[in-house]
């Protein structure tokens, strides 16, 4: 079982905590991680791209010149695709890019992401995380005490309004609950700061 240090909010080590082998101690699968990240990024795409076909472009209802006798090529509409300002053939239309990987693959991906943080020693487990009021300065002080000066993902067991509001104004810091932990967030942040309760909740779901 992986064993990591347990800290308090002041940044002092108060003990150690053993993490589940099944969640935090597996060999990271890079192929599965890649698939999960691509899936999440695809789901984030808006897919609102749109071009107009010849039937949707304004104008072009009448024949520009008669069929024969002008010496010019025959034309039926000034909005056909070969004309400047004409419709587009097989252009993009609004669509959803989202898709889902199998549940087992998604679970393996998040386990791989969490295990990679443990392996790289980029995880900080807190005894608890509570603020009396939403204060960005106080949250910044906690992170500084934990020697976190880069992008960090803060995870608590349940939604905490004070923590969420305190973290959102700090550049590079993202707050999520244990239920919202996902591969993309874990990978793109340099540090994973997670409370003891959140660890237990994640292990309960994924183990």
UniProtKB/Swiss-Prot annotation:
InterPro entries (alphabetical): Ribosomal_uL4, Ribosomal_uL4-like, Ribosomal_uL4_dom_sf
> Which is an annotated Pfam family here?
Ribosomal_L4
Give the UniProt record's GO annotations in the biological process aspect. translation
Keywords attached to this Swiss-Prot or TrEMBL record, sorted alphabetically, are: Ribonucleoprotein, Ribosomal protein, RNA-binding, rRNA-binding
**Which is one Gene Ontology cellular component term of this protein?**
ribonucleoprotein complex
Quick check: keyword DNA repair in the entry? no
* GO molecular-function terms, A-Z: rRNA binding; structural constituent of ribosome
Renumbered residue ranges of the record's region Disordered: 44-78
Instruction: Provide ranges: composition bias, Basic residues.
Output: 60-71
How is this protein organized at the quaternary level?
Part of the 50S ribosomal subunit.
Describe its function: One of the primary rRNA binding proteins, this protein initially binds near the 5'-end of the 23S rRNA. It is important during the early stages of 50S assembly. It makes multiple contacts with different domains of the 23S rRNA in the assembled 50S subunit and ribosome.
The UniProt entry's sequence similarity note says: Belongs to the universal ribosomal protein uL4 family.
- What is the name listed in the Swiss-Prot or TrEMBL entry for this protein? Large ribosomal subunit protein uL4
